[in-house]
Amino acid sequence: MHKLAQLDQRYVWHPFTQMRDWERAEPIALVRGKGAMLEDAQGNKYLDGNASIWTNLHGHNPPQLNRAIKRQLKQVAH
């Protein structure tokens, strides 16, 4: 099991998940995203059909927004 999945099982409560079902399956550890796609620790790719408003509009990891965020973080981190 991927380290992220182990940490998730140990420390994260998923309030809208049936715990009995969740405990039987190995969690998916998402490690990167680009555009509308996500990738897990095993290299499997998924279409993100559950994205937030931000990623619905811009996708995951858009270069222009990443640059703007880096510039802003140099001025004020939060």
Provide a role label for each language-model segment.
Residues 27-48:
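Active-site and channel-lining beta-strand-loop segments
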Residues 1-32:
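Active-site-adjacent loop/helix segments that line or gate small-molecule/cofactor pockets in enzymes
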